[in-house]
Amino acid sequence: MALNLMAKKAIVKQVNSLAKVSVSVGVAEYCGLTVEQMTNLRSSAIDANVTLRVVKNSLAKRALVKTECECVFLVLSGPIILGFSQEDPGAVARVFKNFIKENKNLVVKGLGVSGEFVKSNQLQRIADLPTKDQAIGITMTLMLAPVEKLVRTLIEFPTKVTRVVSAVCD
């Protein structure tokens, strides 16, 4: 059933508002996926805070104009699904990568991360980016290491003195 003009404008507005608040967008061709596979993809996307939208290419191009997601224009062809992530730049890539492990019919065409286009062959690199919580944990570990070493060094001196005195007494 064809969409009327008002419905098309509503879709463009929804996708545009979604694109404006997203830090990354993924474009994948879903040709050959069954309904069950598509449902699994959508549920894994929901778990990862990724919004998936199936949109006609002409409407997607109109919606992505003047947003950071505009960089994916070149790959908007064929039956596509757009994945938007508002929090984690690597979330869309991780969802697509994990889904492709079991379903070879999903073909990732490219990713847009902070206004930069990333080719599909670099999906693994983006998917391996740490999440915000992981990055904070790594940073805190790196910051605490010198402090822990200093504390161990300061504690070691009295321990050595005690051992020397104990050895002399024996």
From Swiss-Prot:
The keyword rRNA-binding applies. Pfam families: Ribosomal_L10 (PF00466). GO terms for cellular component: ribonucleoprotein complex; ribosome. GO terms for biological process: translation. GO terms for molecular function: large ribosomal subunit rRNA binding. Keywords: Ribonucleoprotein, Ribosomal protein, RNA-binding, rRNA-binding. It comes from the Bacteria. InterPro entries: Ribosomal_uL10, Ribosomal_uL10-like_sf, Ribosomal_uL10_bac, Ribosomal_uL10_bac_type. Gene3D superfamilies: 3.30.70.1730. The keyword ATP-binding does not apply. SUPFAM superfamilies: Ribosomal protein L10-like (SSF160369). Belongs to the universal ribosomal protein uL10 family. Part of the ribosomal stalk of the 50S ribosomal subunit. The N-terminus interacts with L11 and the large rRNA to form the base of the stalk. The C-terminus forms an elongated spine to which L12 dimers bind in a sequential fashion forming a multimeric L10(L12)X complex. Forms part of the ribosomal stalk, playing a central role in the interaction of the ribosome with GTP-bound translation factors. HAMAP family: Ribosomal_uL10. This is Large ribosomal subunit protein uL10. It comes from Ruthia magnifica subsp. Calyptogena magnifica. The lineage of its organism: Bacteria, Pseudomonadati, Pseudomonadota, Gammaproteobacteria, Candidatus Pseudothioglobaceae.
